[in-house]
UniProtKB/Swiss-Prot annotation:
Cell location: Cell membrane
Disordered, as annotated region: 285-310
GO process terms (BP): intracellular zinc ion homeostasis
Classification lineage: Bacteria, Bacillati, Cyanobacteriota, Cyanophyceae, Synechococcales
One GO cellular component term noted in the UniProt record for this chain: plasma membrane
Signal peptide segment: none
Keyword presence, Transmembrane: yes
Transmembrane segments annotated in the record for this chain: 10-30, 44-64, 78-98, 113-133, 161-181
Gene3D superfamilies for the chain: Cation efflux protein transmembrane domain, Cation efflux protein, cytoplasmic domain
Record's protein name: Uncharacterized transporter sll1263
Membrane topology per record: Multi-pass membrane protein
Principal location listed in the UniProt entry: membrane
Gene Ontology molecular function: cadmium ion transmembrane transporter activity; ferrous iron transmembrane transporter activity; zinc efflux antiporter activity
Keywords from the named record: Cell membrane, Membrane, Transmembrane, Transmembrane helix, Transport
Length: 310
């Protein structure tokens, strides 16, 4: 459901990428600045990334089936992973153009219209990035957040290029143009590295952030006075979905119905705090020593009450 709600924002990103790419190419054609050309090349990456994000969100919105019982929400990571690869390719192209211009410099055409077009493209990118960031946070979509972060990097890069071109017009220092283009290339490369690292961490089933782990354990506290204990908390993030599992240890004299009602109440409380979560519980008797023997258990990332009964 969340991925389906995010798709219109991916369409917005595609439209914005097409518009900004046209504006920046127009600015390059007027000024001849390789810095603006590098900025336009990065916009092609934005366009490709937006298209991939739309595809990934469409796939992530596909309901779970017999072959994919946990759903398709991890498809969002295809977007950030491929975006990182696109960014590396763009960085190489930017670096090549900058070195070529550094070795064979030529004067820029002084035209205020070119800079005005670049400023308009930057303003459009900034607005769309802000919209995508808010939507990504609200819908817990890593694809939208990654697209927003990339666009904001593009915004700051564009600001630097526009300022540099203006300075060149004032000072006449033509060598600033390729140097700034190289700086843009390194900035794009850093963005690609950051996105790839985030994607790899997510694909390795990284646990939920500490704040969310604390929200989960806070749901346990009201039941500890009843002699209930909890352990083996395991969490992972998969796109816009969070998967949470833990064991619930209750007194052995409890009925199955009472234990079931307790688990239902806890699962509901967690679902209200963690948007898009799927909670799985395992009920165990508190007095049975085997309930405490789990060789694969590791120290949890958040405090759990694991005290054995006296």
């Amino acid at each position: 459901m969340t991925a389906r709600l995010a798709r219109p924002y991916a369409v917005l990103s595609i439209g914005a990428a097409l518009a900004t790419m046209g504006l920046k190419l127009g600015a390059y054609a007027i000024t001849g600045s390789v810095g603006l050309l590098s900025d336009a090349l990065e916009s092609t990456v934005n366009l490709a990334s937006a298209i991939v994000a739309f595809w990934a969100l469409s796939l992530a919105a596909t309901p779970a089936d017999s072959e994919h019982p946990f759903g398709h929400s991890k498809a969002e990571y295809f977007s950030s992973g491929l975006e990182g690869a696109f960014i590396f390719v763009a960085a190489l192209g930017i670096g090549y153009s900058a070195v070529e211009r550094l070795l064979s410099p030529r004067p820029l055409d002084q035209n205020a219209l070119g800079i005005a077009l670049a400023i308009a493209a930057t303003a459009l990118n900034g607005t769309v990035a802000w919209i995508l960031w808010r939507a990504g946070k609200r819908l817990n979509s890593i694809a939208l957040r990654a697209d927003s972060q990339h666009l904001m990097t593009d915004v700051w890069t564009s600001v630097g290029v526009v300022v540099a071109v203006a300075l060149i017009f004032v000072t006449g220092w033509e060598w600033l143009d390729p140097l700034i283009a190289l700086g843009v290339g390194f900035n794009v490369l850093w963005t690609g590295t950051h996105l790839l690292r985030e994607t790899i961490s997510s694909l390795m089933d990284q646990s939920l952030p500490p704040a969310q782990l604390q929200a989960i354990t806070s749901c346990f506290l009201p039941y500890e006075d009843q002699g209930v204990r909890f352990h083996l908390l395991q969490t992972r993030q998969a796109g816009s979905q969070s998967f949470i599992s833990f064991h619930v240890l209750v007194p052995g004299h409890w009925t199955v119905q009472r234990g079931h009602d307790l688990c239902e109440a806890i699962e509901t409380a967690i679902a209200e705090r963690i948007t898009g979560s799927r909670v799985t519980t395992h009920l165990e008797p508190l007095e049975d020593p085997k309930s405490w023997q789990h060789p694969d258990e590791f120290p949890p990332s958040a405090p759990l009450n694991r005290d054995k009964p006296n």
